[in-house]
């Protein structure tokens, strides 16, 4: 509860300035959940979310996806396929405005 969200704190420690638990980064706004699609960048993961959009012409639903780059603090051990929660924060770079706050399934914190 140290960051104002109802998430479990990671067991590991880190010296990352942009960690909401061990650094000085504040979180605000939306909390999203998705699956990690890529961990190829340093300290960054790409979180993919799938959702359905109704198409009135065909009276059916179509699958869409969004890919959100998020900062991955050193205290989390994140791999591809993990389900994570990400929280909105100040812009950390040109594309990153979210940070991983919890691994909800598939990994160890």
From Swiss-Prot:
Q: Which family does it belong to?
A: Belongs to the universal ribosomal protein uS17 family.
Q: Where on the tree of life does the source sit, at the highest rank?
A: Archaea
User: Source organism lineage?
Assistant: Archaea, Methanobacteriati, Methanobacteriota, Stenosarchaea group, Halobacteria
Known InterPro entries for this protein? NA-bd_OB-fold, Ribosomal_uS17, Ribosomal_uS17_arc/euk, Ribosomal_uS17_archaeal, Ribosomal_uS17_CS
This molecule's function is given as: One of the primary rRNA binding proteins, it binds specifically to the 5'-end of 16S ribosomal RNA.
Q: Name one GO biological process term.
A: translation
Q: Which organism is it from?
A: Halobacterium salinarum (strain ATCC 700922 / JCM 11081 / NRC-1)
GO CC, any one term: cytosolic small ribosomal subunit
Q: Keywords, A to Z?
A: Ribonucleoprotein, Ribosomal protein, RNA-binding, rRNA-binding
Name listed for the protein in its UniProt record: Small ribosomal subunit protein uS17
Look up keyword Transferase and say if it applies: no
The protein's GO terms of the molecular function aspect are: rRNA binding; structural constituent of ribosome
What subunit structure does UniProt give? Part of the 30S ribosomal subunit.
């Amino acid at each position: 509860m140290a960051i104002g969200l109802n998430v479990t704190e990671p067991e590991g420690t880190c010296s990352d300035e942009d960690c909401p638990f061990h650094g000085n980064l504040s979180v605000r706004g939306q909390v999203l959940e998705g699956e990690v699609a890529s961990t190829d960048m340093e300290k960054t993961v790409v979180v993919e979310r799938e959702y359905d959009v109704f198409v009135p012409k065909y009276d059916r639903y179509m699958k869409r996806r969004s890919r959100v780059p998020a900062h991955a603090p050193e205290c989390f051990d994140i791999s591809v396929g993990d389900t994570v929660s990400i929280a909105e924060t100040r812009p950390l770079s040109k594309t990153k405005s979210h940070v991983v706050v919890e691994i909800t399934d598939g990994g160890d914190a």
